[in-house]
Amino acid sequence: MYAVFQSGGKQHRVAEGHTVRLEKLEVATGATVEFDQVLLIADGETVHVGAPLVAGGKVVAEVVGHGRGEKVTIIKFRRRKHHDKKMGHRQWFTEVKITAINA
């Protein structure tokens, strides 16, 4: 059984037991989170596709932890002017473990 749900403007395909990194959620570590924007639920033989959401669909997850991703380097450069600017960015994320998928 797997599901596709939406969180943080992105869509994630998950199954029970999977660990997923999502955009940062303001939830404490160890707390339970429910995602109700479920777009698709597949259970072996049957596939429930929402229009746009599956009625009564829910993905339940437990927050494993928070962290920051790898550094992305941004370089702005102007040719022939001896001008360059180097910046970096590390995006915050929340790691969750999927505990249940309810249709």
UniProtKB/Swiss-Prot annotation:
PROSITE patterns: RIBOSOMAL_L21
Single GO biological process annotation from the record: translation
Annotated GO MF terms: rRNA binding; structural constituent of ribosome
Membrane-spanning ranges: none
GO cellular component, one term: cytoplasm
Family: Belongs to the bacterial ribosomal protein bL21 family.
Job of this protein: This protein binds to 23S rRNA in the presence of protein L20.
Matching NCBIfam families: L21
Assembly description: Part of the 50S ribosomal subunit. Contacts protein L20.
Protein name: Large ribosomal subunit protein bL21
Organism listed in the record: Shewanella denitrificans (strain OS217 / ATCC BAA-1090 / DSM 15013)
Gene: rplU
